[in-house]
Amino acid sequence: MVNVPKTRRTFCKKCGKHQPHKVTQYKKGKDSLYAQGRRRYDRKRSGYGGQTKPIFRKKAKTTKKIVLRLECVEPNCRSKRMLAIKRCKHFELGGDKKRKGQVIQF
């Protein structure tokens, strides 16, 4: 389980100094219907004849690499950058911190 705080003080390239950054998890945007590859694929698929490209079925990985999106909280900066961290099965953003000697409650 990887637990990352929602804010982090780190270097901002635009400000040129360490600033607090808001941390969110990167998510892939929706694929465009008008990208060249998609247009070519749709054209090829139209009409008679079935699936024209192989459907990938040999998945190798069980996890994805976590990518953090850091946004500077300075009002007139707001620059964003990505930061990749290692693979993990469970990722948590801003969860409770572990305390030493605490009793585990269910």
Curated annotation (Swiss-Prot):
Tell me the residues on which N6-methyllysine occurs.
53
Report keywords, A-Z.
Cytoplasm, Methylation, Ribonucleoprotein, Ribosomal protein
Name the major location. cytoplasm
Record carries keyword Ribonucleoprotein: yes
The UniProt entry, under Pfam families, shows:
Ribosomal_L44 (PF00935)
* GO terms of biological process kind: translation
* Coiled-coil parts of chain: none
Q: Name one GO molecular function term.
A: structural constituent of ribosome
Renumbered residue ranges of the record's region Disordered: 34-53
- Compartment(s) of residence: Cytoplasm
Q: Name one GO cellular component term.
A: ribosome
InterPro entries recorded: Ribosomal_eL44, Ribosomal_LSU_eL42, Ribosomal_zn-bd
Regarding protein family, the annotation reads: Belongs to the eukaryotic ribosomal protein eL42 family.
Name of this chain's protein: Large ribosomal subunit protein eL42
Q: What is the originating organism of this protein?
A: Pongo abelii (Sumatran orangutan)
Recorded name of the encoding gene: RPL36AL
